[in-house]
């Protein structure tokens, strides 16, 4: 039996219409009437790159938050490297690195090095191991000149690099990215995508799962594409497979056709 980096079986997530965050936990399932994910199932092999695509509200960020254990599924089962996100969240967190676009929640008045040391401690790395990993990642991510600068003085592109370094501190098997090139200019975004493919996936064999609205980015990075709409999984296949399923010539046309088809089927 093949071991998967990620496995989802009929994952559903519902939120109460007037509650969010921790308040959502207080409502019984029967009152959870706003669907964010509905019966999502797919598997991802180790070292694979999977893109999550769909309009705002399709369920991409909700799915990523479930995989990080920030949210729990209402129904169904999600596993990361064989560990259940609901029953074994601590073990799941040891397997994943998570990075979003934006400021990545660093302590802005601390230096880049101080931030990495802090997060290494939160990931239970010893002082010696933290020093080794920071030295390794400094070379991998080109952070040498930045380590002793306050985070608030860094460019958006450099903060992205620092965020990836933080996510990779504990050698995760799976890297989860939400809009990874948001706020980057075109040149910085292109460099960031090259960096992901060559230095993260290529060099380390890391499984990469990312959500993006940039279809050119999806086509460049992803081995497979998961198309979400209204919390439902419409397709999960290679670019060629998605286009064939829709009978379209481009990814953009495919998303439009698959979304319209799903809307007709649910009427």
Question: What spans do the regions from the language model cover?
Answer:
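Catalytic Walker B motif of ABC-type/P-loop ATPase nucleotide-binding domains
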Residues: 175-179
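Conserved catalytic motifs of ABC-family nucleotide-binding domains
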Residues: 171
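Helical segment within the ABC ATPase nucleotide-binding domain
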Residues: 189-204
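Conserved ABC ATPase signature
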Residues: 150-154
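ABC ATPase "signature
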Residues: 236-237
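Conserved ABC ATPase "signature" region
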Residues: 22, 117, 121, 128-146
């Amino acid at each position: 039996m093949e071991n998967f980096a990620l496995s989802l079986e009929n994952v559903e997530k519902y939120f109460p219409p007037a509650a969010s965050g921790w308040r959502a936990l207080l409502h019984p399932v029967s009152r959870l009437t706003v669907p964010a994910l509905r019966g999502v199932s797919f598997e991802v092999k180790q070292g694979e790159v999977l893109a999550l695509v769909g309009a705002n509200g399709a369920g991409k960020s909700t799915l990523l938050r479930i995989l990080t254990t920030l949210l729990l599924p209402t129904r169904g089962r999600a596993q990361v490297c064989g560990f259940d996100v609901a029953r074994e969240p601590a073990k799941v967190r040891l397997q994943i690195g998570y990075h979003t676009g934006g400021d990545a929640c660093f302590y802005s008045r601390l230096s880049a090095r101080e931030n990495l040391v802090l997060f290494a401690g939160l990931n239970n790395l010893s002082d010696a191991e933290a020093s080794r990993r920071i030295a390794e990642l400094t070379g991998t991510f080109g952070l040498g000149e930045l380590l002793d600068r306050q985070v608030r003085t860094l460019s958006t592109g450099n903060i992205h690099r620092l965020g990836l370094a933080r996510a990779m501190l504990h050698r995760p098997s799976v890297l989860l990215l939400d809009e990874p090139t948001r706020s980057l200019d075109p040149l910085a975004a292109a460099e960031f995508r090259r960096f992901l493919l060559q230095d993260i996936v290529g060099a380390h064999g890391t499984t990469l799962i990312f959500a993006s609205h940039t279809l050119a980015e999806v086509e460049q990075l992803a081995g497979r594409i998961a198309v979400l709409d209204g919390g439902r999984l419409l397709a999960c296949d290679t670019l060629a497979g998605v286009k064939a399923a829709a009978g379209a010539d481009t990814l953009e046309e495919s998303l439009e056709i698959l979304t319209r088809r799903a809307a007709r089927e649910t009427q």
